[in-house]
Regions:
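Hydrophobic cores of alpha-helical transmembrane segments in multi-pass inner/ER membrane proteins
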Residues: 35-36, 66-79, 124-138, 197-213
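Juxtamembrane "helix-exit" motif on the non-cytosolic side of transmembrane helices
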Residues: 44-54, 104-114, 171-182
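Membrane-interfacial loop-to-transmembrane alpha-helix junctions, especially the N-terminal start
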Residues: 25-35, 85-96, 153-159
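Short juxtamembrane and helix-loop transition motifs at transmembrane-helix boundaries
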Residues: 26-28, 48-59, 77-90
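C-terminal transmembrane-bundle signature of multipass membrane proteins
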Residues: 168-182, 194-246
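Non-cytosolic membrane-interface motifs at loop->transmembrane helix junctions
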Residues: 54-64, 111-123, 184-195
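Membrane-proximal helix-loop-helix units in multi-pass membrane proteins
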Residues: 95-151
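Membrane-interface helix-boundary motifs at transmembrane edges
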Residues: 20-23, 79-89, 141-153
Length: 253
């Protein structure tokens, strides 16, 4: 009887504080779509206002925005790794990968201040060390945890953004793709513009995945005693607690 009362009391307490769905996953997806559409319009306005040479140049506004988004995603993933008791290894590795991508986008700055390929050594080596330490410490759990974590919205968006950047954007960077069709007034600038714009939206996806990592990690602020499946479900609001009509009768019994 005591156990049933305890369960009934816990259930009534949960019903008294239902999870908020104001910023659940479908709503965030709509917000992400609006942000991407707004970013596209800003690019068009910038090109028409100041010219494509300024917008798409090396270390220009678009590339600096890419760096900012990549750093944002990396920080979000690292914070999620600290907060989550499950899946930390994959989150840390992904955070290091995006951090290295941010450094790679700043390669010309690193070379102008330090030396050729400086980003590989000044940023890549430390990040590689962090990733290796995380892999060694989590080697016994990484396979199981990664299989579960890859089902979450955060890692799904991260994977899509990574595939997009590593395939389509790299194809855009091949000069023959733009010169084989014939000469134009500025084929190199056209190539650079399309590549930078395409990468920008890829990094935007990575930034969204960072937000989803935080949503999963801080789902109702109580993930210490639960698995990543329950945290992801709560963050996406897939499994909402619904009132039980027969709860009073159970307690009465």
């Amino acid at each position: 009887m005591k156990k049933s009362r305890k369960n009934g009391g816990g259930q009534s307490e949960e019903l008294a504080h239902p999870p908020r769905t104001t910023f659940d996953y479908p709503v965030r997806l709509v917000a992400y779509t609006l942000i991407a559409a707004a970013l596209c319009q800003l690019i068009l306005l910038a090109v028409r206002g100041v010219g494509i040479e300024f917008v798409a140049r090396e270390n220009g506004p678009v590339e600096l925005t890419q760096v900012g988004m990549a750093l944002f995603a990396s920080v979000c993933l690292m914070i999620a790794a600290v907060q989550m008791p499950f899946g930390r290894t994959l989150l840390i590795v992904c955070g290091c990968l995006v951090g290295y991508a941010a450094a790679r986008e700043c390669d010309s700055w690193f070379e102008s201040v330090f030396f050729d390929d400086a980003y590989k050594y000044l940023a890549g080596v430390p990040l590689l060390g962090v990733a290796l330490v995380a892999l060694v410490r989590g080697r016994k759990r990484i396979v199981v945890e990664s299989r579960v974590l890859l089902r979450t919205p955060s890692m799904t968006i991260f994977a899509i953004g990574g595939i997009y950047i590593c395939t389509l954007c790299q194809a855009f960077d091949v000069p023959d793709l733009w010169t084989a069709g014939g000469l134009s007034e500025s084929p190199e600038m056209t190539k650079a513009a399309v590549e930078e714009f395409a990468e920008l939206f890829g990094y935007l996806l990575l930034a969204f995945s960072g937000i989803e990592s935080l949503a999963m990690a801080f789902a109702h602020g109580n993930v210490e005693t639960r698995s990543v499946e329950s945290a992801a479900a709560e963050a996406t609001c897939i499994e909402l607690t619904t009132p039980q009509v027969d709860a009073p009768s159970r307690r009465a019994a």
